[in-house]
C-alpha cells in the first residue's frame, strides 16, 4: 500500500540481508522512521527469509498501529511503483536488490551493514541522516553502466544474461586450464590458457576484477575492463576498452566446458567451442547519491589505504 505525504504517494522497497539479528533491529528502525514520515514500506521476503520477517513484523516491530508495511516476494514486479530500493547489508545484498531496481527502473540506495560494502552509499552509523535525506528527497540519481552477455554456439544464441559488476568466464571442472581466444571489436587479440576471464564495468573494478589484478576505474569513466585470471601467456594483461566495444571470448573446441557467472549470482552454461559476447548493457542501474565526496576518498576509506605524509596542494 502506498502512503501519502503532502498529497504525494510514496513507497520504498526494503531489501535486507537475512538471518542477522542486528539487521533485523535496523530494519525495524527504518520502518518506524518511514512511518513517522508517512512513507509506505514494502519488505522483500522469500522462503529463506521467513523467520526474519516474522521477527520484523511482531507487535513491537513493523506491525505497530498505523505502520504501512507490505510483504512482497522476489519477482519482476516486486519494486514496481516504489520510489527507490533501500538495501541493508553488504555488496551481495546490494547486487540482489539491483536486479529488482533495474527491472523497475528505479534507483537503489545501499546502507552498509557488511564488511567492506563498496557499493553502499553510506555506513550504518549514518543511517538516520541518510533516511532523513530520503524523506526530504535530498538526493540525486546517477546511472551506472551494466553488461549484456550473450552465449552463442554455431551462431545460435543459447543463453543470455546481464551484470552490474562483472561477467566471469571460468573453467567448469577446475581441472587443467580453459583454452580461450580473446577478441575485441571483431579482431583477435590473444589466445591463452587460463583459469578464466573477467569482463567488468567501472563499478565492478573494485570487486572481483580488482582481486584478479585489474585496475581501479573511476565510476565517472565509461569503459569495459578485460582481466584474464592466471593466464598462461606472455600477453595476457588487463585491458581497458571503449564502452562501445564488443568483447568476445571463444572457448577452444575440445577444451573444457565453462561457466559464466554474472555478478556471482546468475550462472550461464558455456559448452566447449562456444562464444561469449559482452557489450555495454542496454539498461543501466540507477544509483542514489547522498553526497559528492570524491571517489578517491571513498576508495581510501573502504580499503583503509595509508595516506600519511600527504601534504596536498596549497591554495
Curated annotation (Swiss-Prot):
NAD(+) binds at residues 91-92, 96, 165-166, 195, 206-211. GO terms for cellular component: cytoplasm. The active site is at 91 (proton acceptor). One of its GO terms (biological process) is NAD metabolic process. Its main location: cytoplasm. InterPro entries: ATP-NAD_kinase_N (IPR017438), ATP-NAD_kinase_PpnK-typ_C (IPR017437), NAD/diacylglycerol_kinase_sf (IPR016064), NADK (IPR002504). The keyword Translocase does not apply. Its cofactor is a divalent metal cation. It comes from the Bacteria. GO terms for molecular function: ATP binding; metal ion binding; NAD binding; NAD+ kinase activity. It is found in: Cytoplasm. The keyword Transferase applies. Its EC number is 2.7.1.23. Gene3D superfamilies: Probable inorganic polyphosphate/atp-NAD kinase, domain 1, Probable inorganic polyphosphate/atp-NAD kinase, domain 2. Pfam families: NAD_kinase (PF01513), NAD_kinase_C (PF20143). Keywords: ATP-binding, Cytoplasm, Kinase, NAD, NADP, Nucleotide-binding, Transferase. It catalyses: NAD(+) + ATP = ADP + NADP(+) + H(+). Involved in the regulation of the intracellular balance of NAD and NADP, and is a key enzyme in the biosynthesis of NADP. Catalyzes specifically the phosphorylation on 2'-hydroxyl of the adenosine moiety of NAD to yield NADP. Belongs to the NAD kinase family. This is NAD kinase. It comes from Rhodococcus erythropolis (strain PR4 / NBRC 100887). The gene is nadK.
